[in-house]
Amino acid sequence: MHQNLITRWLFISCIMVILMIIIGGITRLTGAGLSIVEWSPVTGLLPPFSFESWQVEFAKYKAFPEYQSVNYDITLSQFKFIYLLEFIHRLLGRITTLIYIVPLICFYFQGVIKKCKMLPYIIALLLFCIQGFMGWYMVESGLLNNHSVSHFRLAFHLIIAVIIYHILFYQLIKNYCDLLLIPSQKLLLIFSCISITVIYIQIFLGALVAGLDAGLVYNNFPLMGDNFIPIEIQDNLFNLTNLYDPVFMQFMHRLGGFSVFAVNAILVICLFKVKHLQLTKIAYFLIIVLLIQIATGIITIVYSVPIIIASIHQFVAIILLSIIIWCYFLFKNS
């Protein structure tokens, strides 16, 4: 009974975090992230309702660089759209946090979760708290002298969300999934760890690309212009200033994509070699997800970052990570 409660709670929490990640990505892609220029964790629970209230919020927005440099011709109706998108993102963050924290407190005091097993849940709780601050810290960077947020802060904001999901999903499969009765698979465990690491790096690079609008600089594949290494960075490939260069970031994200494919291709081969029915099914599922991820990534580049495809690309990255976390769980406990 208690096990089922924990499983349902973790499943819902995982879904909510995924929604947060996707809506956060859409917020970034639509340029809505800087539309709310204040951080009001308690008083900001309701959007403006009256015309006067909307005018007040619009006036606040006009005082900051994004309006003055980019959206100076935006109408009130257009402002309402981006404002409500950012509002939904923040509201969903509050709801997700409550969905996680309230049952956790109840489970702890009722003894449903034993004290010796609380550590990962406490870490996730702390990350939820840090995430709220990190979100505002990111937004604040776009309200100073720049009309866009720091791509580094954006990347860390995303990675914290992914780590939260990772912790919750791992606890979910520990509660729900059966172990495999197979011999120890150290090689598969090692490749699972490598794959998780490479996917994390690729997600981080993807956030840097999004933060710099780097998906727009080259729109052909597999080359960038007429070269594999774009001409702009050929002479200074290892310069630290490249971390602020959209061309370099798109190049690194492409390299990351090749790395993710290579590592997971090896993992798929290893899964087939075990000749276990469930691992074979996982291998086929991994192939499908990997191909979808590659296809959506290429389409995102070639068609100048269409919002729907880019959002699917981000979602599939989380699914890919989930499969590898599942593999890690199976091989760690084999």
UniProtKB/Swiss-Prot annotation:
<keyword id="KW-0560">Oxidoreductase</keyword>
<keyword id="KW-1003">Cell membrane</keyword>
<keyword id="KW-0812">Transmembrane</keyword>
<dbReference type="InterPro" id="IPR023754">
    <property type="entry name" value="HemeA_Synthase_type2"/>
</dbReference>
<feature type="transmembrane region" description="Helical">
    <location>
        <begin position="282"/>
        <end position="302"/>
    </location>
</feature>
<keyword id="KW-0479">Metal-binding</keyword>
<dbReference type="Pfam" id="PF02628">
    <property type="entry name" value="COX15-CtaA"/>
</dbReference>
<keyword id="KW-0408">Iron</keyword>
<feature type="binding site" description="axial binding residue">
    <location>
        <position position="313"/>
    </location>
    <ligand>
        <name>heme</name>
    </ligand>
</feature>
<feature type="transmembrane region" description="Helical">
    <location>
        <begin position="93"/>
        <end position="113"/>
    </location>
</feature>
<feature type="transmembrane region" description="Helical">
    <location>
        <begin position="6"/>
        <end position="26"/>
    </location>
</feature>
<feature type="transmembrane region" description="Helical">
    <location>
        <begin position="119"/>
        <end position="139"/>
    </location>
</feature>
<keyword id="KW-0472">Membrane</keyword>
<feature type="transmembrane region" description="Helical">
    <location>
        <begin position="305"/>
        <end position="325"/>
    </location>
</feature>
<dbReference type="GO" id="GO:0006784">
    <property type="term" value="P:heme A biosynthetic process"/>
</dbReference>
<keyword id="KW-1133">Transmembrane helix</keyword>
<feature type="transmembrane region" description="Helical">
    <location>
        <begin position="154"/>
        <end position="174"/>
    </location>
</feature>
<comment type="function">
    <text>Catalyzes the conversion of heme O to heme A by two successive hydroxylations of the methyl group at C8. The first hydroxylation forms heme I, the second hydroxylation results in an unstable dihydroxymethyl group, which spontaneously dehydrates, resulting in the formyl group of heme A.</text>
</comment>
<feature type="binding site" description="axial binding residue">
    <location>
        <position position="253"/>
    </location>
    <ligand>
        <name>heme</name>
    </ligand>
</feature>
<comment type="pathway">
    <text>Porphyrin-containing compound metabolism; heme A biosynthesis; heme A from heme O: step 1/1.</text>
</comment>
<feature type="transmembrane region" description="Helical">
    <location>
        <begin position="255"/>
        <end position="275"/>
    </location>
</feature>
<comment type="subunit">
    <text>Interacts with CtaB.</text>
</comment>
<feature type="transmembrane region" description="Helical">
    <location>
        <begin position="189"/>
        <end position="209"/>
    </location>
</feature>
<keyword id="KW-0350">Heme biosynthesis</keyword>
<dbReference type="GO" id="GO:0016653">
    <property type="term" value="F:oxidoreductase activity, acting on NAD(P)H, heme protein as acceptor"/>
</dbReference>
<comment type="similarity">
    <text>Belongs to the COX15/CtaA family. Type 2 subfamily.</text>
</comment>
<dbReference type="GO" id="GO:0046872">
    <property type="term" value="F:metal ion binding"/>
</dbReference>
<protein>
    <recommendedName>
        <fullName>Heme A synthase</fullName>
        <ecNumber>1.17.99.9</ecNumber>
    </recommendedName>
</protein>
<dbReference type="GO" id="GO:0005886">
    <property type="term" value="C:plasma membrane"/>
</dbReference>
<dbReference type="InterPro" id="IPR003780">
    <property type="entry name" value="COX15/CtaA_fam"/>
</dbReference>
